[in-house]
Amino acid sequence: MAASLSSRLIKGIANLKAVRSSRLTSASVYQNGMMRFSSTVPSDSDTHDDFKPTQKVPPDSTDSLKDIVENDVKDNPVMIYMKGVPESPQCGFSSLAVRVLQQYNVPISSRNILEDQELKNAVKSFSHWPTFPQIFIKGEFIGGSDIILNMHKEGELEQKLKDVSGNQD
């Protein structure tokens, strides 16, 4: 009886894809019937500060978010705005973009857009591009993971990154 009940519970849970409410956002990724990743992000006032997203830019900062994005793009030969960080991407598209860029042994600067919704909106406004990741090379907006992958396959990315310091190819 217990095995049957737990089996039905597991099957029911496995069929859940995503839940959204005003208090909670949750998503799970399944592969071959097995849960590979699950996340829950509380978004209510009762959430302890340790579990709330952090804001990297102090609210009283004299730099506007637009200035921060402009400086990021200008000061970093390879800049990626992504979900997560290069060492731990939080979505498949961000992971793909990082893996492609890492093939060229170039220093990758990044910002985690999951940590600051206002920064995320500022980046969208700056690039006029709605999705993430967003990759800039030598100050030029390139696009997302699909564009980087296509450039890699066509040999264009190697040319674009040819004189970026740290490139050992």
Swiss-Prot record:
GO CC, alphabetical: cytosol; mitochondrion
Binding-site residues, glutathione: 83, 120, 132, 145-146
Principal subcellular localisation of the protein: mitochondrion
Gene Ontology biological process terms from the UniProt entry: protein lipoylation
Keywords on record: 2Fe-2S, Iron, Iron-sulfur, Metal-binding, Mitochondrion, Redox-active center, Transit peptide
Annotated binding of [2Fe-2S] cluster, by residue: 91
Pfam families (alphabetical): Glutaredoxin
Membrane-traversing stretches: none
Matches recorded under InterPro entries: Glutaredoxin, GRX_PICOT-like, Monothiol_GRX-rel, Thioredoxin-like_sf
Molecular function in Gene Ontology: 2 iron, 2 sulfur cluster binding; disulfide oxidoreductase activity; metal ion binding
Superkingdom in the source lineage: Eukaryota
Transit peptide: 1-37
Subcellular location: Mitochondrion
Ranges of residues in domain Glutaredoxin: 66-168
Coiled-coil spans in chain: none
Residues covered by region (Disordered): 38-61
Assembly description: [2Fe-2S]-bridged holo-homodimer. Interacts in vitro with SUFE1, BOLA1, BOLA2 and BOLA4. Interacts in vivo only with BOLA4.
Family: Belongs to the glutaredoxin family. CGFS subfamily.
Function: May only reduce GSH-thiol disulfides, but not protein disulfides. Participates probably to the maturation of iron-sulfur proteins and to the regulation of the redox state of the BOLA proteins.
PANTHER family per the UniProt record, alphabetical: GLUTAREDOXIN FAMILY MEMBER, GLUTAREDOXIN-RELATED PROTEIN 5, MITOCHONDRIAL
NCBIfam families: Grx4 family monothiol glutaredoxin
Protein's UniProt name: Monothiol glutaredoxin-S15, mitochondrial
Organism: Arabidopsis thaliana
Taxonomic path: Eukaryota, Viridiplantae, Streptophyta, Embryophyta, Tracheophyta
